[in-house]
């Protein structure tokens, strides 16, 4: 049964996200993916997969520039083992993370929260429901694209499960530890450090996300433990009061330290909070009430412009029933409800408010609603899957009815979110024959794939990264001068970006081109999202050099032209 449920969930997820993607080589044509693809190519070329150095790709003058490298390292390993293109490795890895980490992880967390007799029905339900919402995993494959965060969120259920084991070992009132794990301390000793290391390498902020999800659990468990001692051990009441006072004092000190850090780190004396977090990802896209409705109805933003999934009414109704029953009957899983309300509130603030308070509370996630909404299934799945067997306990076939209900809910949810998720993936991963708004189209991709025959090995390709030339490494095995759309570039890179139209008249241009190993330029009139981004202006001289015929055309594909620089030859 469990194998069948896992298989159904994996197949459903694969169909949801890839049924509208016409080829396994197609990739997300989004801003962030340029970095992710080229970072993986950099690892393959240099052998350096260190988190301490990965961002030197866009900050080449820095000795240390940290960026979580777990995703890129895994993708590079897949390429080395299979000899497949990086783009196929990314798509395969996305499916593997969902199948091997997220789905089993959230099912394991759910099983940890129920007694052994209910474990099969709970696990089966969680396996099915793991892919039944649009919040995660699908949305992070469309928005961004946020591959490191996608990997990091998949690890959070396992981290929360380890917290559950830890609390069971330190809180005797909870009990039932060894019937689910016969060696809990060994599990903590081995899996705990490995999880922290893995989460840090996947994305360090996932540690904060896991803490935010587990915070209500810690408070809930601590309160239950102190309340039990207060009732059963009157002689300890004075000590309990001191413990509570210490916790409150520690909270005040921690809050003060955080306020001081924010004030100093973000230079609030000269730049108010309102001037921070003003990028696209931080702008409110919903009203407060609209965002609340999304949390309640499980209507997820997909990541594609103006596209959300339809409300999951059956699952939303069952979720509300489960939450109400858990709170009214004071179940040990009540913390899941409070955690859902807590994370949901953060999402509402990120999606529906531009206030200073919203920025402070959600700044750890860049006020990005997608990073926060991805945490909701971590709580929805365990809450529903652990409560249904208890609600069905008095029926004739409690386990079968609970599992069957989960199956119906999962199937109806898959059918509901399929059109929106499919459309979002189609729009984001499409490779049109000719288009001026995507990063690369079919004509340019064809030219990029000819680069190995046209550009000698060891030569870099220069171009405006906003028009697809930044993908020369991924599609043409030739390193681009600009491996991302923006960065803290070297003086030579800035010279060729801003003064290429002075070829033949400014010796500094040829000197910079020589040091960068550049004699080939790829030009195209296209631009991601149709152009207009101020960051693209610094590359305008590259287009002017082509317009002024300062370079020799070598190969043309539609409006895309590969040029050779002859004016710098001695």
Regions found by a protein language model. Name each.
Residues 10-154, 173-179, 429-438:
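Active-site lumenal/periplasmic loops and adjacent helix-entry segments of GT-C-fold
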Residues 32, 143, 147, 201-316:
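Transmembrane catalytic cores of multi-pass membrane glycosyltransferases
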Residues 23-29, 83, 135-151, 272-288, ...:
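Membrane-helix boundary/interfacial segments in multi-pass membrane proteins
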Residues 245-252, 390-420:
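Signature aromatic-anchored transmembrane alpha helix within multi-pass, membrane-resident enzymes
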Residues 9-11, 124-128, 192, 213, ...:
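Transmembrane alpha-helix segments characteristic
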Residues 297-300, 310-337:
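Hydrophobic, aromatic-rich transmembrane alpha-helices
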Residues 179-182, 186-204:
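Membrane-interface alpha helices of multi-pass inner-membrane proteins
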Residues 414-570:
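Extracytoplasmic
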């Amino acid at each position: 049964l469990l194998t069948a449920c896992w298989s159904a969930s994996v197949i459903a997820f694969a169909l949801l996200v890839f049924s509208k993607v016409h080829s396994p080589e197609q990739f997300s044509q989004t801003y962030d993916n340029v970095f992710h693809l080229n970072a993986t190519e950099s690892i393959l070329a240099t052998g350096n997969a260190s988190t301490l150095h990965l961002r030197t790709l866009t900050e080449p003058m820095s000795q240390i520039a940290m960026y979580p490298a777990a995703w890129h390292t895994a993708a590079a390993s897949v390429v080395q083992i299979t000899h497949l293109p990086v783009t196929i490795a990314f798509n395969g890895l996305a499916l593997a993370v969902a199948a091997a980490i997220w789905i089993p992880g959230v099912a394991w967390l759910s099983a940890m929260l129920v007694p052994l007799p209910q474990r099969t029905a709970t696990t089966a339900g969680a396996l099915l429901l793991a892919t039944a919402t649009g919040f995660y995993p699908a949305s992070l494959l469309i928005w961004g694209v946020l591959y490191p965060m996608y990997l990091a969120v998949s690890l959070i259920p396992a981290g929360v499960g380890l917290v559950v084991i830890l609390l069971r070992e330190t809180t005797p009132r909870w009990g039932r530890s060894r019937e689910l794990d016969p060696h809990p301390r060994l599990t903590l000793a081995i899996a705990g450090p490995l999880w922290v290391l893995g989460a840090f390498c996947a994305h360090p902020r996932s540690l904060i996300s896991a803490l935010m999800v587990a915070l209500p659990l810690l408070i809930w468990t601590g309160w239950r433990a102190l309340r039990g001692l207060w009732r059963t051990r009157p002689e300890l009441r004075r000590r309990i009061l001191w413990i509570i006072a210490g916790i409150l004092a520690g909270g005040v000190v921690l809050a003060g330290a955080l306020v001081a850090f924010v004030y100093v780190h973000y230079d609030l004396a000269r730049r108010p909070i309102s001037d921070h977090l003003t990028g696209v990802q931080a702008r409110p896209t919903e009203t407060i009430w609209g965002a609340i409705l999304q949390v309640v109805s499980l209507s997820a933003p997909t990541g594609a412009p103006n596209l959300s999934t339809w409300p999951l009414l059956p699952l939303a109704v069952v979720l509300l029933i489960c939450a109400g029953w858990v709170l009214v009957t004071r179940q040990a899983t009540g913390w899941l409800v409070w955690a859902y309300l807590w994370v949901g509130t953060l999402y509402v603030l990120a999606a529906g408010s531009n206030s200073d308070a919203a920025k402070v509370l959600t700044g750890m996630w860049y006020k990005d609603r997608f990073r926060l909404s991805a945490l909701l299934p971590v709580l929805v799945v365990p809450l529903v899957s652990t409560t249904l067997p208890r609600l069905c306990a008095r029926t004739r076939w409690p386990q079968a009815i609970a599992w069957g209900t989960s199956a119906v809910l999962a199937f109806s949810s898959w059918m509901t979110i399929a059109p929106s998720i499919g459309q979002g993936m189609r729009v984001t991963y499409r490779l049109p024959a000719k288009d001026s708004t995507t990063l690369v189209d079919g004509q340019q991709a064809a030219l990029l794939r000819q680069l190995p025959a046209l550009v000698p090995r060891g030569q870099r390709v220069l171009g405006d990264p906003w028009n697809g030339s930044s993908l020369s490494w991924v599609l043409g095995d030739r390193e681009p001068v600009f491996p991302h759309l923006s960065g803290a570039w070297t003086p030579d890179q800035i010279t060729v970006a801003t003064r290429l139209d002075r070829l033949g008249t400014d010796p500094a241009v040829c000197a910079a081109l020589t040091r960068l190993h550049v004699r080939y330029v790829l030009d195209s009139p296209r631009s991601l999202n149709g152009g207009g981004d101020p960051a693209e202006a610094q590359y305008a001289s590259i287009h002017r050099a082509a317009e002024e015929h300062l370079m020799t055309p070598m190969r043309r594909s539609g409006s895309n032209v590969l040029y050779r620089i002859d004016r710098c030859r001695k």
